[in-house]
């Protein structure tokens, strides 16, 4: 991994720098002393007690290194684990670099003491002493790079990358037949819980960058898995109650039949994060809905209907939660992502019609909760889907249009002007697309409205020339704005409305 490579590079450069400096220092001293021979450079055979004196500070140096490492790790790891995930401690201890460094320092410290004990009046274990000296130097050379490695290890971005790498590796090993599917499932369940915990805690602390990285990482996991799913063994798709605690027997049966436990597990983390984001981090909401939409679109493109169905079910859960919380901003974003998904369904009339039905259903649910503005905005998005279906000559175009015009434009406190305008925009767009038969259906739907009200709506739509809305929004485009060629069709549609 990148952190490990940085550690190795730092260690090599530090070792090289120390070697060059110490060698140059020795060469200068040796030259200044008149090039003394080997017998004058060593205490061996002359005064072995000096060798013990030499190794005593080395033992203390090792103790200092170990003390610094243990103090740093003992403080930093638990504190960071408390912020992100308790499993961080286990991750740290399982990391190969940490195991090697801590083990090498402990063995090196013990070896210095062992070498010092071996020294006797007539015996000098020179290879053991040399190993102790060079081991001490290498330990100090590794100290600073390893400190940086530990700090990077605790970076939540790196933690998320490690978790994602573990999941991808487990999938790859199962695909190649080198890991039992049940064992891989256990690994993945644990890694998913850890990732979800980091994302949720980041949202709670308003740590937006980490939350967004976690969401993005989950999306990448699903993308990678989607490319491998067809190659996974049959045993991979079998799960039991232990894997989904709380699920009914019927639910488990559906999961096994649809072979979508992995998507369900990952996207459950999306949903839990979404629930937290509704109250604390509004900028995480578009990231979650966009990731879900991308997952659904990719599933459609590779012909994985089961994965598509799971993604859309979670979309509906998001909509339900937003309606319950009466969060218009979240609904505004979800409706946009939902309509964008329709672009990948134009050659799938049944799925496109189902999307239109759900659009209408949740728009009406929003109205029932008093969110009439959300329902009217849904009219624009559902109308956009109807126009795209008509342009693609989709067999479902009339069905999607019927869902759009079925939205009630007559409210308890009077006509809903925004929805009326949305229907007029759709009617004009259908004329532009040479679908006068469908435009007539829209006109018939608006026939219960007074002519002066319809004329006012047409006039206001004609007057909109600025494409961008006058406030900063996620979409930025004014929903009432119409392209010139589209606006030119307002007059013919007004004729269908009987406005002359």
Language-model regions: role of each:
Residues 2-6, 44-54, 58, 92, ...:
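Juxtamembrane loop-transmembrane helix junctions in multi-pass integral membrane proteins
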Residues 1-19:
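Alpha-helical transmembrane segments and their helix-start/interface "positive-inside/aromatic belt" motifs
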Residues 10-15, 62-65, 100-104, 130-137:
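Alpha-helical transmembrane segments
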Residues 91, 95, 117-188:
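Canonical alpha-helical transmembrane segment with a positive-inside/aromatic-interface signature
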Residues 20-34, 48-119, 140-151:
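Transmembrane alpha-helix detector for multi-pass membrane proteins
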Residues 36-45:
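Membrane-interfacial helical/loop segments at transmembrane boundaries in membrane proteins
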Residues 152-500:
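Soluble C-terminal extramembrane regulatory/interaction domains of multi-pass membrane proteins
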Residues 82-91, 122-142, 198-224:
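Hydrophobic alpha-helical transmembrane segments and immediately flanking/interface helices
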């Amino acid at each position: 991994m990148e952190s490990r490579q940085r550690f190795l590079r730092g260690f090599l450069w530090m070792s090289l720098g120390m070697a060059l400096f110490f060698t140059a220092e020795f060469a200068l001293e040796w030259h200044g002393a008149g090039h003394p021979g080997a017998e004058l450079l060593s205490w061996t055979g002359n005064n072995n007690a000096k060798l013990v004196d030499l190794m005593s500070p080395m033992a203390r140096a090792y103790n200092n290194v170990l003390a610094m490492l243990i103090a740093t790790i003992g403080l930093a790891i638990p504190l960071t684990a408390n912020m992100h995930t308790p499993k961080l401690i286990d991750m740290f201890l399982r990391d190969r670099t940490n195991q090697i460094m801590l083990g090498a320092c402990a063995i090196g410290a013990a070896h210095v003491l062992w070498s010092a004990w071996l020294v006797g009046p007539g015996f000098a274990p020179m290879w053991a002493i040399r190993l102790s000296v060079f081991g001490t130097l290498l330990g100090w050379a590794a100290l600073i790079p390893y400190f940086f490695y530990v700090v990077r290890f605790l970076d939540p971005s790196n933690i998320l990358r490690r978790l994602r790498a573990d999941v991808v590796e487990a999938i790859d090993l199962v695909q190649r037949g080198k890991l039992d599917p049940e064992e891989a499932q256990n690994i993945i369940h644990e890694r998913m819980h850890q990732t979800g915990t980091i994302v949720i805690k980041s949202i709670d602390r308003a740590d937006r960058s980490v939350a967004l990285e976690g969401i993005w990482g989950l999306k990448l996991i699903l993308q990678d898995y989607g490319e491998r799913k067809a190659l996974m063994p049959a045993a991979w798709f079998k799960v039991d109650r232990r894997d989904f605690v709380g699920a009914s027997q019927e639910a488990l049966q559906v999961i096994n039949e649809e072979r979508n436990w992995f998507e369900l597990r990952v996207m459950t983390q999306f949903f839990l994060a979404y629930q937290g984001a509704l109250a604390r981090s509004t900028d995480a909401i578009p990231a979650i809905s966009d990731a879900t939409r991308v997952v659904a679109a990719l599933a459609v493109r590779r012909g994985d209907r089961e994965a598509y169905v799971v993604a859309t079910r979670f979309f509906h859960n998001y909509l339900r939660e937003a309606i319950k919380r009466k969060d218009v901003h979240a609904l505004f974003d979800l409706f946009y992502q939902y309509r964008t998904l329709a672009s990948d369904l134009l050659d799938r009339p049944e799925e496109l019609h189902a999307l239109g039905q759900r659009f209408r259903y949740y728009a009406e649910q929003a109205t029932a909760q008093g969110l009439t503005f959300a329902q009217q905005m849904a009219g624009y998005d559902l109308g956009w889907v109807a126009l795209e279906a008509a342009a693609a000559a989709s067999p479902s175009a009339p069905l999607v249009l019927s869902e759009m015009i079925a939205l009630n434009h007559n409210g308890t406190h009077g006509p809903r002007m925004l929805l009326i305008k949305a229907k007029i925009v759709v009617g004009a767009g259908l004329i532009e697309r040479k679908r006068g038969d469908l435009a007539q259906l829209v006109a018939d739907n608006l026939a219960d409205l007074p002519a002066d009200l319809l004329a006012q709506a047409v006039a206001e739509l004609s007057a909109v020339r600025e494409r961008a809305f006058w406030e900063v929004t996620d979409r930025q485009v004014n929903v009432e704005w119409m392209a010139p060629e589209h606006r030119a069709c307002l007059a013919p549609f007004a004729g269908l409305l009987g406005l002359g």
